[in-house]
């Protein structure tokens, strides 16, 4: 398989399938509503899941936990969000929808054991938002922190605009310019292009 494969759910949230090694072990970035499609692809291609890394706890990025049997990592500041999708999903769909609470084990991504992965803490969209950098792939996965042409909302539960601005200046600036940035929604682009063309980055970044 290619090193990075994207799946997009009906909620427009992206799930990325990552192959950081020269073998059939793959890792997932986020577990959105279309996780069954991703699992089917993995099984059809005889791949082995090494684990999943969740950028933040919003339902459109974490509700797939209920169908996921492998090891999953999240910043524990967002554990409550990830475990309780019913608290969020009803507002999105217009009706109160009941979704079972996730009772499985969640691992603290800040204690991960993988040499190929760097984790950046970037609160703003949620308190526990993080980005994942795979240096060998030249890729960074930002969830709803940074998009190609925008940034994540800060008016939802545990969001904070001042923290978002701080994260842009203290975390986004650490990403290498030639790396490809893969967001939680929409298309990817290079970090330097986003730095130069994203109007929110241009406004908030203290050059």
Question: Residue spans of the language-model regions?
Answer:
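Conserved beta-strand hairpin/beta-sheet module of binuclear metal-dependent hydrolase folds
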Residues: 1-45, 131-143
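Hydrophobic residues at beta-strand termini and immediately following loops
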Residues: 7, 109, 122
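Residues that act as N-cap/strand-start positions at coil-to-secondary-structure junctions
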Residues: 12, 101-103, 126
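Short, glycine/acidic-enriched loop or turn micro-motifs at the edges of active sites
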Residues: 22, 33, 59, 78, ...
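Active-site neighborhood of phospho(di)ester-bond hydrolases with catalytic His/Asp-centered motifs
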Residues: 28-30, 50-58, 72-75, 121-124, ...
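Active-site HxH/HxHxD metal-binding segment of metal-dependent hydrolases
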Residues: 33-112, 199-203
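Conserved N-terminal boundary motif of the eukaryotic protein kinase catalytic domain
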Residues: 116-118
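Metallo-beta-lactamase
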Residues: 121, 126-207
């Amino acid at each position: 398989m290619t090193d990075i494969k994207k799946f997009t759910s009906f909620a427009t949230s992206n799930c990325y399938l990552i192959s950081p090694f020269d073998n059939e072990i793959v890792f997932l970035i986020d577990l959105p509503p279309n996780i069954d499609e991703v699992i089917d692809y993995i099984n059809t291609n005889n791949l082995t899941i090494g684990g999943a890394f969740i950028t933040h706890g919003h339902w459109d990025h974490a509700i797939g936990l209920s169908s996921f049997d492998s090891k999953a990592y999240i910043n524990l500041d967002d554990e409550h969000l990830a475990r309780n999708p019913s608290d969020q999903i009803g507002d999105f769909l217009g009706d109160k929808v009941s979704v079972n609470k996730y009772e499985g084990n969640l691992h603290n991504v800040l204690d991960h054991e993988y040499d190929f992965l760097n984790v950046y803490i970037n609160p703003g969209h949620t308190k526990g938002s993080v980005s994942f950098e795979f240096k060998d792939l030249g890729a960074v996965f930002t969830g709803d922190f940074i998009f190609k042409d925008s940034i994540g909302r800060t008016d939802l539960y545990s969001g904070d605009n001042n923290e978002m601005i701080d994260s842009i200046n203290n975390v986004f600036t650490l990403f290498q310019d030639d790396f490809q940035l893969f967001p939680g929604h929409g298309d990817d682009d290079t970090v330097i292009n986003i730095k130069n063309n994203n109007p929110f980055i241009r406004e908030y970044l203290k050059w």
